[in-house]
Amino acid sequence: MIIFKNLILKISSLRFAISLIIFIAITSGIGTFIPQGSDNKFYVDNYNSAPIFGFLDGEKVLKLQLDHVYTSFWFLFTLILLCISLAACSFRRQIPSLKASLKWIEYKSEKKFSKLQLNTSHPINQDGDHISKVDLLLKKRGWKTYKFKSHISARRGLIGKIGPLVVHIGLIILLIGSAYGSFTSQSKEQYLLPGESLDLVNESTNSKANVKLVDFSIERESDGIPKQFISKLNFYSEDLNLNEIKTAKVNHPIRLKGLTIYQADWAISTVVLEIDNILYQLQLKEIPEIGNQVWGVLVELGSETKNNFLLTIDNENGPLKISNIENFSGENLYLNDDPLEVNSSKVSLKKVIPSSGLIIKNDPSIPFIYFSFILIIFGTIISLIPTNQLWILVNKESQKLSIGGLSNKNLVGFKKEFFKLSEQIKNF
């Protein structure tokens, strides 16, 4: 029993909770640094030759489950331990503190008033119902009072005592929701060309929906740097009686029927070329060896002798660079411009078709996450409300009215109010 109590004391301590939070923050940072969810070969190939921090090679990454940090047993165990720590702290400290603050404390002796943060006294006449007058004044000022025969206990701002408990509940819901989302969330990245569609199935409701990319555009700065990617999507579903068009932008996802669709990326998927009076629609692939966001394709050009040429492009407005793979000399081909003669073939660029990179995510834990943040914000705000307490004692033998006060926050502000009330009571 003693061991169990000592364990609870340790788990519910602030130092222990802070240690867990720091550990979670560090491991979460590692999870963003190391790519998550790739196959084992990726980690072995990339980290055996260049270990992380000089000692974490591919085998150690896999063994320590750093390839899936957020669903690893040790990360989830830490979340559970933090939940237990917060719950233990709530039951051991917050709830008893709240219960204690609900009890009315009586100060029947003038000696006790000298120990309070603020105290003063005034002479009174034996005649007059001073307690009733003070009680009425305090109630008008928004104080909750408990009147006795010769003394009054008053308090205000008790809701501030609930704040830490609400924050703890919000954090527990956040941790549980995060763990739940790690196992239940589904995510899919899809590139769509204008006119292409994607069928979505919600397994929990067995409902189907079709998402069609109506239009995709890119806003650019004056220097050509991408500013915003915009996808106009049509959602259609007979099961859900749905047919509407919504717009997804970077940092402005679409939320619909439990799904969240993010505008995540873009690509140049296709170019339409006219080669010797024949139209060709060529599929492009990203070529990271040449540069960031450069797409290209290898084609044969020439009416008599065929030679290989590399076509590359990095902007939906062009130009398309045509390079000879032997010496990488090349020319730029502009959109809807005059044809270029390349190895005796006439080539013109008719159309550049960019595709929209979308991430479609189904995360049942989102409502829990949002609700937890609401609780945390609400709890933090109300915890800033000071809890003030007043005691008034009438001693007819010494013909003195004593006033004392306590405040857990903003003592300066409470001090001003305290002496203002004292002057009003003095005038009785």
Curated annotation (Swiss-Prot):
Residues that span the membrane, as ranges: 14-34, 72-92, 162-182
Keyword terms, alphabetized: Cytochrome c-type biogenesis, Membrane, Thylakoid, Transmembrane, Transmembrane helix
A cellular-component GO term for this protein: plasma membrane-derived thylakoid membrane
Major localisation: membrane
GO BP terms, alphabetized: cytochrome complex assembly
Membrane disposition: Multi-pass membrane protein
Top-level taxon in the UniProt lineage: Bacteria
UniProt cross-references to Pfam families, sorted A to Z: ResB (PF05140)
Subcellular location: Cellular thylakoid membrane
Function: Required during biogenesis of c-type cytochromes (cytochrome c6 and cytochrome f) at the step of heme attachment.
Family according to the record: Belongs to the Ccs1/CcsB family.
Subunit (UniProt): May interact with CcsA.
Annotated protein name in UniProt: Cytochrome c biogenesis protein CcsB
Species whose genome carries this gene: Prochlorococcus marinus (strain MIT 9215)
